[in-house]
């Protein structure tokens, strides 16, 4: 299980939201590329980067920060937020993004999902399944898709998706701990390589996730707020798991 630090970009700053609420955001840095450099120095290998403006269809706002992060860090980068057409996929491929995260498009545009799988290595195509009360949210978590996350996962498995990020939005940004039951059910029901996201507050949370008794081990865990608030030491977490 790998530990994946997160940077969420809003107006070119690193921020964290509380339960996905844009009205409850806290700014942590106006130089997010420096955060990425720090994560690399502390032993991380993969960065979870989210374009929050892009997720709301406010495209291009964070482009400079995304480029600078890609150019200045040795980390592999998985990027999501606003990837809803072939041109965006091609652009991110061109600038060296390692993995593309499709969220809204995975729900609303199965043809784009198929295109991504047909034209890029499966390892590079990740689907974000973001849910609250069992229902998938889209468009920056601001719209209800009406699709249950288990139904979406059934579709993704049939489509050939191998990698997903699952976020329990009710836990995200709360430091209240992960939804262990949900991850256990997913890992025992589906063939995906799963990355957990939402609620991480301590090394104990990471240990609890790594100790889940499942058919497939958890691939990774995303953590953001716990790092920024000093609740979790990244280097220690990486060496302990």
Curated annotation (Swiss-Prot):
| Protein's GO biological process | L-histidine biosynthetic process; L-tryptophan biosynthetic process
Q: Which GO terms describe its molecular function?
A: 1-(5-phosphoribosyl)-5-[(5-phosphoribosylamino)methylideneamino]imidazole-4-carboxamide isomerase activity
For this protein, the Enzyme Commission number is: 5.3.1.16
Which compartment or compartments is the protein found in?
A: Cytoplasm
Q: Which UniProt keywords are listed?
A: Amino-acid biosynthesis, Cytoplasm, Histidine biosynthesis, Isomerase
Question: Where is the catalytic site?
Answer: 8 (proton acceptor), 130 (proton donor)
Principal localization reads cytoplasm
Pfam families found in the cross-reference section: His_biosynth
What pathway is this protein a component of? Amino-acid biosynthesis; L-histidine biosynthesis; L-histidine from 5-phospho-alpha-D-ribose 1-diphosphate: step 4/9
Output the InterPro entries linked to this UniProt entry.
Answer: Aldolase_TIM, His_biosynth, HisA_bact_arch, Isoase_HisA-like, Isoase_HisA-like_bact, RibuloseP-bd_barrel
Group of enzyme by EC: isomerase
Can you list the GO cellular component terms from the UniProt entry? cytoplasm
Q: Which reaction does it catalyse?
A: 1-(5-phospho-beta-D-ribosyl)-5-[(5-phospho-beta-D-ribosylamino)methylideneamino]imidazole-4-carboxamide = 5-[(5-phospho-1-deoxy-D-ribulos-1-ylimino)methylamino]-1-(5-phospho-beta-D-ribosyl)imidazole-4-carboxamide
> Which family does the similarity line name?
Belongs to the HisA/HisF family.
What NCBIfam families does the record tag this protein with?
1-(5-phosphoribosyl)-5-[(5-phosphoribosylamino)methylideneamino]imidazole-4-carboxamide isomerase
| Record-linked PANTHER family | 1-(5-PHOSPHORIBOSYL)-5-[(5-PHOSPHORIBOSYLAMINO)METHYLIDENEAMINO] IMIDAZOLE-4-CARBOXAMIDE ISOMERASE (PTHR43090:SF2)
Protein name, per record: 1-(5-phosphoribosyl)-5-[(5-phosphoribosylamino)methylideneamino] imidazole-4-carboxamide isomerase
């Amino acid at each position: 299980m790998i530990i994946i630090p997160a940077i969420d970009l809003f107006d070119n700053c690193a921020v964290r939201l509380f339960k996905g609420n844009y009205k409850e955001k806290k700014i942590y840095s106006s130089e997010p590329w420096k955060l990425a450099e720090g994560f690399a120095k502390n032993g991380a290998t993969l960065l979870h980067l989210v374009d929050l403006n892009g997720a709301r269809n406010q495209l291009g706002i964070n482009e400079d920060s995304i480029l600078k992060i890609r150019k200045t860090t040795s980390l592999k980068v998985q990027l999501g937020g606003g990837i809803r057409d072939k041109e965006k996929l091609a652009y991110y491929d061109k600038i060296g993004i390692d993995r593309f995260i499709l969220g809204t498009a995975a729900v609303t545009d199965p043809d784009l999902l198929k295109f991504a799988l047909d034209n890029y290595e499966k390892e590079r195509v990740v689907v974000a399944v973001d849910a609250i009360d069992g229902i998938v949210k889209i468009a920056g978590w601001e719209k209800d898709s009406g699709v249950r996350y288990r139904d979406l996962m059934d579709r993704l498995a049939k489509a050939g998706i191998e990698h997903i990020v699952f976020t329990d939005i009710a836990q995200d940004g709360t430091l209240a701990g992960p939804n262990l039951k949900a991850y256990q059910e997913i890992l025992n029901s589906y063939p995906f390589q799963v990355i957990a996201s939402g609620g991480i507050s301590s090394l104990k949370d990471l240990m609890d996730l790594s100790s889940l008794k499942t058919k497939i081990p958890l691939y990774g865990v995303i953590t953001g707020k716990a790092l920024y608030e000093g609740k979790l030491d990244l280097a220690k977490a990486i060496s302990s798991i």
